[in-house]
Amino acid sequence: MIKSPIRKPVQALQAVSFEVGPGEICAVVGPNGAGKTTLFRILVGLTTPTSGFASVLGYDAVTQSVQIRRRLGWLPTDDASLLQRLSCGDNLRFHGRLKGLLGRELETAVQDALEVVGLREVARTAVLTLSSGMKARLRLARAIMHKPQVLILDEPTAAVDPVGAHGLLNLIVDIVRQGDLAALISSHRLDEIEALHSHVVLLNKGTLLFDGDLDDLRRDIDRPHLELAFGSQQGFLDARTHLAELEGVEVIRTIDNEIHVAVRRGVSLGPVLLRLENTLEDLLELRQVKVPLRDLLAEIYGTVKRDPE
């Protein structure tokens, strides 16, 4: 797929293909410029590729966009799509009419959607008076009110505080599972992505780096990480020196008398511990730690950037 701006054609996405099944959430991850927003906008019909092919549920994203929109729920990042001076209920009524809902069917859809997202008590409240978390829930209600088969959620928790974001994410998971929906979600809050234990797609400069389970990503790419805590500064200093001299071992960070190291895949831990033999009397604790997703992705994308063109 190629999206052409005014001055110069840019290949925004290249051979990006993956499947998301019913009841499954797929997290689309990548740095700025990776192609996440372009991908979402093409799938929902807001951007037309100048070449290439995109499909949702077997429908062509360009020639059959109407059929896709009937079956797809879209939650954009910001509140600009909400009519701020209208009530929550009237916002949904307006959107429902655009989806072809009328009369009793429309009113039932409005009330059901408000109930699902916990906003029924503020149905008559103007949107401009709502908190950012409630606005995010209203956007979610709008995305699900016509009972779609697919949900596309672009940074749904971006403007929401951590407590509200946690509740919103749990709500999304419940909606996807109970409705047996296929969902795409993007987020810069990588702790949220990790909490989903979901299917993950990694994009970089419009290309697909990885498509699979997060656990598979860790098995394929993750290196063993160790934390060592010492009872004296001298033991800490000696160990840091020895570790820095070992091939295949990288000192990630040091805090007080603790050292965090990454061991290259395929490197045995035996020689590492043997090198520390003279400092073992000062070693208080040795533990293997799970690497935060943000560190794992930073390593992946850092490797990509270092690769020759």
Regions found by a protein language model. Name each.
Residues 44:
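Helix-to-loop junction immediately C-terminal to a conserved catalytic motif
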Residues 147:
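Conserved catalytic motifs of ABC-family nucleotide-binding domains
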Residues 151-155:
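Catalytic Walker B motif of ABC-type/P-loop ATPase nucleotide-binding domains
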Residues 169-263:
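ABC transporter nucleotide-binding domain
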Residues 263-309:
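C-terminal coupling/interaction segments
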